[in-house]
């Protein structure tokens, strides 16, 4: 099976929030907002971005009881809802809408617009991303997301 890889590139960090851009090939699809990036193997439940993973996480479609709809779920394990990385695990990591780190609980938020100064995103991109990934899956592709942390740059 052929593989389609989305690339999530994290580029701006604060104490509680991480901004990124999600690409397909070299084209930006949307902006992302996640909880704080922590050292590999360190997790604070609901306040930690999933770890950088150059090999990529699998993306599947899973029904969310919380959100009451099918959503894109990231995973590494056979149960298709669990990520095991760095000696810790994350479960039910969905791409979804939201505006700030308060909305993430460890999930990547996706949106069309970003306010970098205030670490906010807006105009959710959840539905277009779901539609795109679902179409690739229906066409027989395996879809993954590779996550890269760019170095922190202090502009002060």
What name fits each language-model region?
Residues 1-143, 149-156:
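Cell wall/extracellular polymer interaction/catalysis modules
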